[in-house]
From Swiss-Prot:
Gene3D superfamilies: 3.30.160.20, 3.30.70.1660, 6.10.140.1950. This is Peptide chain release factor 1. It is found in: Cytoplasm. Peptide chain release factor 1 directs the termination of translation in response to the peptide chain termination codons UAG and UAA. One of its GO terms (molecular function) is translation release factor activity, codon specific. Keywords: Cytoplasm, Methylation, Protein biosynthesis.
Length: 358
């Protein structure tokens, strides 16, 4: 581990030397690449320098204890030694986490698909509530939401909603949300007061750029139809809605949220790129999982990941056995505790894998 850290420190110093040369800005592409690499390495290099300084403090305290006879000075050295040793353990753990491989998609925007599953109207109502939950969380993170498609059930529920969340690090925070979300409560339509269980499927996909996915437009078929739902005066009077079919995979995407056919077409292509990119990521994940211990969940949208029990005010994430009795807060978008716990569990699993390799 420390050989790797020393290599990173040397590389960081090389970059700084290059950036200090007066001619560095002559090649703007090279300059931007160096600046990005410096930013990427900055945090781990700073932490490694802190580690080295703390080790030096320990050595100096030990030397002082060997040489010093004054009791007051010896007590100060003992305190400094104890503090430095405790700090060293913490810094070493922080370095291990910083050395974990970065997910190249973490900084990306996300496309979110929420669909009602088992439970009919009750599932659709809960799908709408999950949309509100993620919208509230996005609001606290100062992210922007862009609706792509909405299929309502007539009583305030969503059979399906597709939307994009634009914001730095959106995928890093929301990537653990993919899977089946189960709700247990008494539906408003239940006259007998019985608790029902319904399910909603959530898919979180990183936005795919054109460079991420090779898309042959000859493989795409576009059909237009009249919008049904919100959309202003153009609803049901113009063929502005778009249905995109990707013939090699059979993926079908409908977008009708915009009044413009062209905008709906662009949104459908964004969703298609994200789904094709997700298929590639799933293949890579399956290959990696065959060689490594499982991390936090499988990322499979068919995996049951969480239960929201309204009579008990309880939310349980089954992957990490986390139970919270702050259900109302969670449904109002206060997801940070859950997200932080999932991130920590994922990091712990990756650390275990890394230690097996050393």
């Amino acid at each position: 581990m420390f050989d790797k850290l020393e290599d990173l420190l040397i590389r960081f110093q090389e970059i700084q030397n290059e950036l200090n040369e007066p001619t560095v800005t002559n090649d703007q592409a090279r300059f931007r690449k160096l600046m990005k690499e410096q930013n990427d390495l900055g945090e781990i290099v700073d932490k490694y320098l802190e580690y080295k300084q703390t080790k030096k403090n320990i050595e100096e305290s030990l030397e002082l204890l060997d040489e010093e006879s004054d009791e007051e000075m010896r007590e100060l050295a003992k305190e400094e030694l104890s503090t430095s040793k405790a700090n060293l353990v913490v810094i070493e753990e922080q370095l291990k986490i910083l050395l974990l491989p970065k997910d190249p998609n973490d900084s990306k925007n996300v496309i979110v698909e929420i669909r009602g599953g088992a439970g009919g109207d009750e599932a659709a109502l809960f799908a709408a509530e999950l949309f509100r939950m993620y919208s509230k969380y996005a609001e606290t993170m100062r992210w922007k939401i862009d609706m792509m498609n909405l299929n309502e059930n007539g009583i305030g529920g969503f059979k399906e909603v597709i939307f994009m969340i634009n914001g730095q690090g959106a995928y890093s925070k929301l990537k653990y949300e993919s899977g089946v979300h189960r709700v247990q409560r008494i539906p408003v339509t239940e006259s007998g007061g019985r608790i029902h269980t319904s399910t909603v499927t959530v898919a979180i996909m990183p936005e795919a750029e054109e460079v991420d996915v090779e898309l042959n437009m000859n493989d795409c078929r576009f059909d237009v139809f009249r919008s049904s739902g919100n959309g202003g005066q153009c609803v049901n009077t113009t063929d502005s809605a778009v249905r995109l079919t990707h013939m090699p995979t059979g993926i079908v995407i409908s977008c009708q949220d915009e009044k413009s056919q062209l905008k709906n077409r662009d949104k459908a292509l964004k969703v298609l790129r994200a789904r094709l990119y997700e298929l590639e990521l799933e293949k890579a994940h399956d290959a990696e999982a065959a060689a490594r211990k499982s991390q936090v969940g499988t990322g499979d949208r068919s995996e049951k990941i969480r239960t929201y029990n309204f009579p008990q005010g309880r939310c349980t994430d089954h992957r990490i056995k986390l139970t919270s009795h702050r259900l109302d807060d969670i449904m109002n978008g206060d997801l940070q505790e859950v997200i932080d716990s999932l991130t920590a569990a994922d990091q712990a699993a990756k650390l275990s894998n890394m230690q097996d390799e050393y």
